[in-house]
């Protein structure tokens, strides 16, 4: 007779254990929607209830460490969405589910859609940190995409006025709640990119329920944020509210006010920049004045080494040009410095840093006064030395010799007359005296008699 294989024989315990493992390993974690009934909460704090629909029911348990995170009190007959693990209670062989999280049915379905879209976009790389665009520092103009009547816009504008009142703001009004809101938000983002007038955008709204914030979990909005060439800061709801837009944006701010803080500069930073610019201005003025003074000294020394009147005149002309250039350069620097100071003071006046601004203004006035005194003293000293040099040159000038009674006579060819053989009767001669010229005609030429030396015997 052929041998027959003995079938496997399970004990009840082994059977229940095998079924439990099969359920836990094969089914894993699932989402289940249904109606609560037979809800109880013993002293242990755990929740026990039945989840049912029109044709079936299943026993459920939700342990205390999980049900503490539920934000509402479950009621009999309430429709809910739960995330649970399927298992088997071995001692009694009861099939049941262990609930990890619970939400009202409406929010639960939205949460399920949220998780599905989040996984899809993450798989496509829309959340990749390497693709995040850096924010400009500092921002030259900020765009705000939100409701024009909402509290979020009010909060953003208040923060920007307090921190950086000179920062321009462009508002792109849009609905942030309702069926039309996602399309309007997408159009606002596309419009901001088309106009290209801002270098950073704040996209967001105030707090609300999951349904209120759902526009920012819309796939169209997420893809518009990802496609934006302009960096986007998301600011949706409160710090505990996290939307799909937060994952896609280049930076997430917990609130609209925090977003305004991120994209703006504060008054202290601007004041530090003004102080640094003032220090650079003072150093540039001192350096320029020292260079001009050294150059003037060298030119004056070279001028003193020149004796002929013509060279002196040339050096005088050069000195005047250099002095004019120096004056123009100083005037130009002072004008540019004054204009820059005026612009900075206007910005500071808008931010009310009055005590430091008064001190800075007083310092600039002192420097202007000192600069005027130094330039005036240098010019006076130069004029005095230049006058002395002219007096000295005039003392040794040929004109001074003429003033003592001498004269210079030139022939018709313009050469200085040194001998009688250079002229003939009838020639016209020109004689230079100290106070003018005299023209005369030669009538007679009488050579001087040569003096003979006596012979020594």
UniProtKB/Swiss-Prot annotation:
Complex formation: Heterooligomer composed of large and small subunits.
UniProt EC number: 3.1.11.6
Enzyme class: hydrolase
Function in brief: Bidirectionally degrades single-stranded DNA into large acid-insoluble oligonucleotides, which are then degraded further into small acid-soluble oligonucleotides.
Name of the protein in its database record: Exodeoxyribonuclease 7 large subunit
Major site of localization recorded for this protein: cytoplasm
Catalysed transformations (reactions): Exonucleolytic cleavage in either 5'- to 3'- or 3'- to 5'-direction to yield nucleoside 5'-phosphates
Domain of life: Bacteria
Keywords: Cytoplasm, Exonuclease, Hydrolase, Nuclease
Subcellular location field: Cytoplasm
GO CC annotations, alphabetized: cytoplasm; exodeoxyribonuclease VII complex
Any one biological process term the GO annotation gives: DNA catabolic process
Pfam families named in the record: Exonuc_VII_L (PF02601), tRNA_anti_2 (PF13742)
């Amino acid at each position: 007779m052929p041998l027959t294989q003995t079938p496997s024989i399970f004990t009840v315990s082994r059977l229940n254990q095998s079924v439990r493992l099969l359920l836990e390993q094969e089914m894993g974690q699932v989402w289940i929607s249904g109606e609560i009934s037979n809800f109880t909460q013993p002293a242990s704090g755990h929740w026990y209830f039945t989840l049912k629909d029109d044709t079936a029911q299943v026993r459920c348990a939700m342990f205390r460490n999980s049900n503490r995170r539920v934000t509402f009190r479950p009621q009999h007959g309430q429709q809910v969405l739960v995330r649970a693990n399927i298992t088997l209670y071995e001692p009694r062989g009861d099939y049941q589910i262990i609930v990890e999280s619970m939400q009202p049915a409406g929010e639960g379905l939205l949460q399920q859609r949220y998780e599905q879209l989040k996984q899809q976009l993450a798989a496509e790389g829309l959340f990749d940190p390497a693709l995040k665009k850096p924010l400009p520092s500092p921002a030259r103009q900020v765009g705000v995409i939100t409701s024009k009547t909402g509290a979020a816009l009010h909060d953003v504008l208040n923060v920007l006025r307090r921190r950086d009142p000179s920062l321009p703001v462009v508002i792109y009004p849009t609905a942030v709640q309702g069926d039309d809101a996602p399309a309007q938000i997408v159009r606002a983002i596309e419009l901001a990119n088309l106009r290209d007038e801002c270098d950073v955008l704040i996209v967001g709204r105030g707090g609300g329920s999951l349904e209120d914030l759902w526009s920012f979990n819309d796939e169209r909005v997420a893809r518009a944020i990802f496609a934006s060439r302009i960096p986007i800061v998301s600011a949706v709801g409160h710090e505990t509210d996290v939307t799909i837009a937060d994952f896609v944006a280049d930076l997430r701010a917990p609130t609209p006010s925090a977003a305004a803080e991120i994209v703006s500069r504060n008054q202290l930073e601007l004041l530090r920049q003004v102080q640094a610019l003032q220090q650079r201005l003072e150093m540039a003025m001192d350096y320029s004045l020292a260079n001009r003074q050294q150059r003037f000294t060298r030119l004056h020394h070279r001028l003193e080494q020149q004796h002929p009147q013509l060279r002196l005149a040339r050096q005088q002309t050069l000195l005047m040009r250099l002095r004019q250039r120096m004056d123009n350069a100083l005037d130009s620097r002072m004008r540019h410095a004054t204009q820059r100071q005026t612009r900075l003071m206007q910005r500071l006046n808008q931010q009310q840093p009055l005590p430091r601004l008064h001190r800075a203004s007083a310092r600039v006035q002192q420097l202007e006064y000192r600069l005027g005194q130094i330039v005036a003293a240098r010019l006076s000293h130069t004029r005095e030395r230049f006058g002395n040099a002219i007096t000295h040159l005039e003392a040794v000038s040929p004109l001074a010799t003429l003033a003592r009674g001498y004269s210079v006579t030139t022939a018709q060819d313009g050469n200085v007359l040194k001998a009688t053989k250079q002229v003939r009767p009838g020639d016209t001669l020109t004689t230079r005296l100290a106070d003018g010229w005299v023209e005369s005609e030669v009538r007679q030429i009488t050579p001087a008699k040569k003096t003979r030396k006596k012979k020594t015997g």
